[in-house]
Amino acid sequence: MDRASVIIINYKTPDLTVDCLKSLSEMDVSSFPRIIVDNKSPDNSIDLISDYLNRNNLNDSVDLIASDKNAGFSSGNNTGINVSNSEFVLLLNSDTIVRPGAIELLVKTLEENPQMGMASPCLEWPDGRPQESCFRFHRPINELIRSAATGPITKIFHRYEVPLRVSDKVLYPEWTSFACVLIRSQVFEDIGLLDEEFFMYFEDVDFCMRAREAGWNIIHNPDAHVVHLRGGSSPVKSQAAKKKRLPRYFYESRSRYYYKHFGRFGLFRANIYWHLGWVVAMVRKLFSRNYQSNICEKQWRDIWTNFCNPAAPYIHPDNY
C-alpha cells in the first residue's frame, strides 16, 4: 500500500494542472503516486498533459485517466479514489501550487493524530496572503447573515458565521476547503465516497459533516502552505464577486445540502432567512451609498431551485 495518493481533477485547465504537477516534483514518486482525472474536457487538455508527461518521463509515475463523462467534482475525485491504494488520499485542485514540504507535513499530521480523519493546509495567494479555508457548517441562519451583510446582524449571530478567522495556530474546523485536503482512507471505508449528486459546491461540506457524524475530526496545520489561485474551472467565485447570476448547479447543490442535513423545513427556513436578509440589504442600500450587498442577480428566485424536489438529480450544465 502506498503512503498517500495525490488526485488532481482537470477540466479545461491543462496549463494549471501542469503547473500543479511541477510543484509536486520534490515528492518521492514511489511514496506519493499521482492520479490525474480529466473530466472529459472539450479542449485539448488530454493531449497537452500527455505531452508534458512524455517529455518529462512521468508516464510511469502519473496515472492519467480520461473520464468518459463530466459528472462534476465529486465524481471525478471518486474515480481517482477508486483506483488509489494508499493509507491517505490527497485531493488537490488543479489551480494550486504546493509549497515545499506541505504534503509531508499533512501526512505526518494525520500519522501523529490517529483520531483525525482529515488534515488541511494554509491556503494562500501567490503573494503569501492567507485565504479563508476553515469553516463552521452552513446552517439555515447563515443565510440571514450573508444576505443582510449588516454589522449588527453579524454581531448578534457571530457564533454561526461560516468562515473561521484566519489563524497561525492549529485549528479544528467543522469543515475545510477541498481545494487541498488530505483524507485518511479509513474515512471512505466508514462513510463512503463523495456524494456525486453534488455536481459542484457543498460536496465538501456534506462529506465533512458525514465524517464528523461518524466520529472523525479535522485538523488544520497552518505550517503547511499551498497556493490557491481560485476559480480555475468554475465561474462561481468570480460571478459572485461581480454580483452576476450564479450557475444553476450551485443552487441545486445548496438545496440538496440543506434538505439532506436539515430536512425540508430546514431548507424552507434557509430560504426565508435569506429573504429576510435581502429586505435588510435593500433598506441599507436605500440609505447608504457605500453599502456593499452580497446579493447576486436573480438570487431571490434562484434560491428556490429544486425546492419541491431537493433530492432530484442535478441538471448537467450542458443541458441548461
Give a label for each model feature.
Residues 7, 213-294:
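Active-site-adjacent helix/loop segment of glycosyltransferases
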Residues 22-31:
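Short, acidic, metal-binding catalytic loop of nucleotide-sugar glycosyltransferases
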Residues 23, 38-49, 69:
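A conserved acidic beta->alpha catalytic loop
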Residues 66-84, 105:
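Glycine-rich, basic loop-to-helix element that forms the pyrophosphate-binding segment
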Residues 89:
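Short aromatic/hydrophobic "clamp" motif used to bind/position activated sugar donors
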Residues 97-134:
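Conserved donor NDP-sugar-binding/catalytic core segment of glycosyltransferases
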Residues 138-174:
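Short, flexible, basic/aromatic active-site loop/helix in glycosyltransferases
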Residues 166-168, 174-225:
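A short, conserved alpha-helix in the catalytic core of glycosyltransferases
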